[in-house]
Each structure stands twice: as structure tokens, then as C-alpha cells.
């Protein structure tokens, strides 16, 4: 099956379903960015269009970013040496931590990986119109202000 998938340049799931879905050609727009995270290995995939993707045998679904008032997910932003210093008052324990901070601009996206028992601090260029998202170690996706 793997060899057939390579020859046809079609993923195995599409072969098994017997259908090939072609996405309509729409311009990519960072306002439509979608996040896909594997629950097994934590792999993160982003796309500006709906895609069919799998990882570790799991079909991935795009997550809808939720708003939260939880103070541990609210960034504290200060200026430092011509850059933004973004920090979170999150305990960052092994049981729960901020795994990724994602910043989205009109033309680019940046993913910063964070780790348990590490201070939740990121330095970013001073750019206006920045949107931020947090993905937790438990796979929750939050839009943060």
C-alpha cells in the first residue's frame, strides 16, 4: 500500500476511502490559519486552508481557538531593547505547561516551543497587528490578548 501511495502521490487514507478530494484554489490568508496537533506525539501542523492530515495513525482535526480569562494564559508584555518580552504567569509543571506560543502576523507565523519546568518567557520583534495563540501540553488551543 505504501508503494502504491508513493507512485500515485496520494495518501493512503484517500486510497482506502476510494475518493480524492481536491481543495478549491483560494488565496492563503493568515486570518484563516488553522492548527492541527497530534495527540500522540505533539507534532504541530498549520495551514491556511482545510487539509486532511494524519500523524501517528490519528486523523488530525483543526482546533478552534477558545478565549480564556485564566490569568496563567494572559501574556505580560513589556518592551526590552527594541523588542517585546512576553511572559506568562504559568506554573509550567510537568503535568501541565504551555507547549507552544504561536504568533501570527499578516504574512508570517512563528512557533516557539516551551518546555515543562522552564520559565514561560519569549522575546519577539516589535511588530504591530500580532495575534497570539497558546497550545497547552494537554492540547488545548487558546487565543490570547
Indicate where each model-derived feature is located.
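Hydrophobic micro-packing sites on short alpha-helices
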Residues: 1-9, 15-16
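Short amphipathic recognition helices of helix-turn-helix/homeodomain-type DNA-binding modules
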Residues: 11-29
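Residues immediately within or flanking Cys/His clusters that coordinate Zn2+
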Residues: 35, 52, 133
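Short cysteine-rich clusters marking metal-coordination/redox-active sites
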Residues: 38-41, 55, 136
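Cysteine-rich micro-motifs
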Residues: 49-62
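Short metal-binding segments enriched for Cys and/or His
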Residues: 60-77
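Exposed aromatic-hydrophobic patches
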Residues: 85-88, 119-127
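Edge beta-strands of extracellular beta-sandwich domains
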Residues: 139-145
Amino acid at each position: 500500500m505504501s508503494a502504491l501511495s508513493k507512485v500515485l502521490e496520494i495518501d493512503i487514507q484517500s486510497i482506502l476511502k476510494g475518493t480524492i478530494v481536491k481543495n478549491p484554489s483560494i488565496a492563503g490568508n493568515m486570518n484563516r490559519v488553522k492548527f492541527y496537533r497530534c495527540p500522540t506525539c505533539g507534532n504541530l501542523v498549520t495551514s491556511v486552508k482545510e487539509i486532511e492530515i494524519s500523524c501517528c495513525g490519528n486523523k488530525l482535526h483543526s482546533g478552534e481557538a477558545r478565549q480564556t480569562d485564566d490569568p496563567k494564559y494572559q501574556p505580560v508584555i513589556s518592551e526590552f531593547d527594541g523588542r517585546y518580552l512576553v511572559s506568562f504567569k504559568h506554573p509550567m509543571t510537568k503535568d501541565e505547561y504551555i507547549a507552544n506560543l504561536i504568533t501570527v502576523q499578516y504574512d508570517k507565523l512563528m512557533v516557539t516551543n516551551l518546555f515543562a519546568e522552564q520559565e514561560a518567557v519569549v522575546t519577539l520583534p516589535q511588530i504591530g497587528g500580532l495575534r497570539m495563540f497558546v497550545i497547552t501540553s494537554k492540547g488545548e488551543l487558546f487565543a490570547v490578548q
